[in-house]
Amino acid sequence: MFFSIIGFLSIGISAYAQDILTADHFLASVAERYASIKDYQAKVSIESAKVAMKGSIIHKRPNLLRIDFSQPVEQVIAYNGETLTVYLPEYRAVLSQSSPTAGKVATASLASAQGLSTMRRNYTASFTTGPDPVPLDEKSAELVIKLTLTRRSMSEGFRELKLAISPETKLIRRIEGRTIADEQVILDFSDIVLDQGIPEARFAYDSPASANRYNNFLFKEND
């Protein structure tokens, strides 16, 4: 009986290890998919207990990013390869950060090759419910493969990430993050269009002249 129990536990441990490896392999294939994408545009929504935001996002490899929000109206987040700019119309304020590191901050938790590289390096992946596609939501007809990513160290801002990925396109449909303060943040991506040859000029943002500017809002340039 003792050896039967040991054998049963060994099978369970082996299956668990195989699940982790398979999930990591699938995440690697998603990362390869995003590494092959030159640019994309999509609709994006960001929700938490405190805010609900909607807008359109454009991204160009390796780290150019712009989000134009329709909610809040006129709010913008843009990174042009040199400067990260955030315009907050409610406060007539422009926050800017000029540093190569700012680009990594901008794309670290987004659907991008750089973001996926960060996830693979700093999180351990497993299937949320198994390797088979499941509904995106309880009543949704859209099927996705769900991964749960658990942080490897306490230094990560999100202690857990959940990804919903299209099994056909290997594009991320949803990212759910659980912060260290136990707050949930959800990013939804829809109407994704790939490789349209988005020009770099579209990532430049001219802020209103009347807005107040606050430089180096993340960190000092020499930090």
What do these predicted ranges mean?
Residues 121-217:
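Gly/Pro-enriched, hydrophobic low-complexity segments
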Residues 12-53, 61, 196, 207-223:
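N-terminal leader/targeting segments and the immediate start of mature chains
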Residues 52, 71-73, 157-160:
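Short, small/polar residue-rich loop motifs at catalytic or cofactor-binding pockets
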Residues 1-12:
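Bacterial N-terminal signal peptides
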Residues 92, 97-142:
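Flexible, surface-exposed loop/linker segments and immediately adjacent secondary-structure boundaries
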Residues 50, 90-92, 181:
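Solvent-exposed strand-loop boundary residues in beta-sheet-rich modules
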